[in-house]
Amino acid sequence: MLKVEMLSTGDEVLHGQIVDTNAAWLADFFFHQGLPLSRRNTVGDNLDDLVTILRERSQHADVLIVNGGLGPTSDDLSALAAATAKGEGLVLHEAWLKEMERYFHERGRVMAPSNRKQAELPASAEFINNPVGTACGFAVQLNRCLMFFTPGVPSEFKVMVEHEILPRLRERFSLPQLPVCLRLTTFGRSESDLAQSLDTLQLPPGVTMGYRSSMPIIELKLTGPASEQQAMEKLWLDVKRVAGQSVIFEGTEGLPAQISRELQNRQFSLTLSEQFTGGLLALQLSRAGAPLLACEVVPSQEETLAQTAHWITERRANHFAGLALAVSGFENEHLNFALATPDGTFALRVRFSTTRYSLAIRQEVCAMMALNMLRRWLNGQDIASEHGWIEVIESMTLSV
């Protein structure tokens, strides 16, 4: 099996000053191309350290993706490190220099002399185009390893990997079949509870069950070879049965996107009134393109469940909205949710049974509870659902 590794560079990445989202994206993207990473390393802006690790990994990896260090400043050392590791010099890539000059000219700017550095590549390098920036990439062969050097800007990195590097890998290597990966996301049950229920299922050969907890949700992932797809799809029915009503969506699209599509398909507009969630619902749904009308965030105030229910009923009527959703303020570990619909208004009062979670986590959980309440109504289900440490203590229905 092809041994693929990644090397992230830069002091800011090494010291945790920025999150290495490029590494997470590449690992996930390559995994779904049948190229799971076998190792990831991070090195700072030190020429000796870079040369050392390039030479070291060249003895072990078949492919190494090097990210960062292709900019115009003195701490951008990747091209020099690659040339030094190979024992050769840097040469000016005249065509890329002209392309950079054109890039700046079209934007009404004069290219700084320091940018010339970005056109200096190791003598034996294969040029890799960057259609969205000034840092071209390049590839070199060092010992057994084919190394690709890529820019650190995420948008440039992703374009280069998808459109330049992956096609080269497909040309040069015999890649395995793409793995089958089935995913669903749950809300309301703990990871240990789900695992205990699912561990009794018999997995086909080469198939693994994975769990990813990211408060307030848990993702279940069944991964295996394409040869086992039929058996996996049969097993997946059992996984969904065991997970039960905690399943909120399948795939990777996300709940806000699925709710948005359902609202559009059914021609429902939605108005929101948020207190404790502070605009999280509006943010998540607007990013997904949901048909939102007037949305408000108001200061927290103590309300009875009846007050919340009547208020959101009036708001739906006043804004001529198809649906209206409210999250009340948080008082004494209690919170109200209310959803006004053409069928009536449905309201829940919940109680938090623990105080150990941060404000941000509590807000995320409550936003998900509100979205799940909306999802369940759209699917014709009872709107009440509980979370492991949130208990529904009162419910109310107002008739149309």
Swiss-Prot record:
Organism, scientific name: Escherichia coli (strain SE11)
UniProt cross-references to InterPro entries, sorted A to Z: CinA, CinA-like_C, Competence-induced_CinA, MoaB/Mog-like_dom_sf, MoaB/Mog_dom
Protein name: CinA-like protein
Protein family according to the UniProt entry: Belongs to the CinA family.
